[in-house]
Structures are given as C-alpha cells and as structure tokens.
C-alpha cells in the first residue's frame, strides 16, 4: 500500500515536471473533496447568492498564482494546501457577502485562521439528514433541536474532528495536519467525540428502531 508520504512526494514531483497541465489534472483529482467541503461549510444564508463552482474557480486561480510558493516549500500534502486555500476563499466570501447583508450579529464564526468552524446546527442538520427515515420526517425538527443542544455541549475542537472525519472524509493524518495537532491527539479527540455522539444518539428514543 502506498504511504501518504510517498503520495505527497509523487504529487510534488508531478507538479514540478508537468507545470500548469499537471496542476489542472491534480486539482481535478481533488475537486470532489474540495466541493464537499464548500457545500458543507457554506453559510445557508448565501445559498442562491454564491455558487460552489464559483468558490472552486476562484480557489483554482489562487492556487495557480501561488503554486510556486508551495513548490519552494511543500511542507504539507498537496490536498491539505488546496484545502487551506479553498477555505480562505470561503472565509473571504463569507466576510464579503455577510458584510453586504449588514448582518454583523450573525457573522460566520472563524477560528484558528485556516478553516471555517463547523457549527452545531450544520452538524446536527447533516446527522438528521443521514439518520432519519422518510417516515419520521415530521419529527426532524425535534431531533435537530435535541442534537444541536447536545452538540453545543461538546468541545468545539472535538466537534470539528467529527466534521473533518465524517463529512470531509479526511484521514486521521490529514485531520492532524489541518488542525495543527499531533496524530495521537487527533485520534484521541475523534474517539472521544464519537463516544459522545453515540451517547447522544443512544439516549434519544427518536433514533430507536421502528
């Protein structure tokens, strides 16, 4: 099995040898994952005003502009770097559009400088969509409120780890890179968050078998 370090080196070498064509190909390879990130983290108030494809196009232009800086010092895997730039474009988009909407009290929360924070509401909404059957559609608001309240009590970084692992589908190594923590810490936080989530779900009769 190919190790992450090997894949990292191969992508860097491919970029150095292939130029803009290689960059376009590699961005395309990672595009589905980047699109999933934008879809999950885009503020719902911007639906209809901001298109996911526009975010990705802007991210690609910024990647093209800064690729040499990355190649001069490729300290993180290519995908993590692409994700950082995409998230920064998303942060800038939120700031720009929310400022225009004059909604300072509800401005999207941004933490640690390199990602848009996952809210309890968005995480709960995803879980409700994934875990409830059509026959229980009428109960979803109640489920959503229960989950949101419980997730609000969870450590913010633990909650973010859940998002990175389950919705962005990052590996433990990638989570550690994104959050700037040790791999063991990322793993421990994931286990802790998963146990907490299972406790929340097991304690809710709304998720019992029909």
Predicted regions and their residues:
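A short, charge-rich alpha-helical start-of-domain segment used by transcription regulators
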Residues: 2, 6, 14-39
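Short, small-hydrophobic-rich alpha-helical interface motif
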Residues: 15, 34, 38, 55-63, ...
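DNA-recognition helix of helix-turn-helix
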Residues: 147-150, 158, 164-167, 172-203
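Amphipathic alpha-helical segment used for protein-protein interaction
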Residues: 34, 113-160, 170
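Conserved RNAP core-binding helix
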Residues: 8-9, 27-28, 47-69, 183
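Hydrophobic-face residues of short alpha-helical interaction/recognition segments
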Residues: 34, 38, 42, 63, ...
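Structural recognition of an alpha-helix C-terminal capping motif at a helix-to-coil junction
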Residues: 54-61, 76-88
């Amino acid at each position: 099995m190919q190790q992450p370090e090997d894949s990292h080196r191969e992508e860097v070498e491919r970029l150095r040898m292939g130029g803009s064509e290689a960059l376009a190909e590699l961005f395309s390879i990672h595009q589905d994952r980047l699109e999933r990130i934008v879809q999950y983290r885009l503020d719902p108030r911007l639906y209809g005003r901001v298109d996911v494809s526009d975010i990705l196009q802007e991210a690609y232009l910024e990647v093209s502009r800064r690729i040499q800086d990355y190649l001069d010092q490729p300290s993180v895997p290519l995908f993590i770097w692409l994700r950082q730039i995409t998230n920064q474009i998303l942060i800038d988009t939120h700031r720009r559009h929310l400022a225009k909407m004059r909604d300072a009290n509800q401005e999207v929360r941004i933490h640690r400088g390199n990602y848009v924070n996952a809210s309890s509401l968005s995480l709960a909404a995803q879980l409700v969509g994934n875990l409830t059957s059509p026959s229980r559609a009428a109960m979803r608001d109640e489920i959503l409120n229960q989950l949101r309240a419980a997730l609000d009590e969870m450590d913010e970084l633990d909650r973010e780890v859940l998002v990175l692992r389950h919705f962005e589908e990052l590996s433990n190594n990638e989570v550690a890179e994104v959050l700037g923590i040790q791999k063991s810490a990322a793993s421990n936080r994931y286990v802790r968050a998963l146990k907490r989530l299972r406790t929340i779900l097991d304690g809710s009769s709304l998720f019992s078998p029909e």
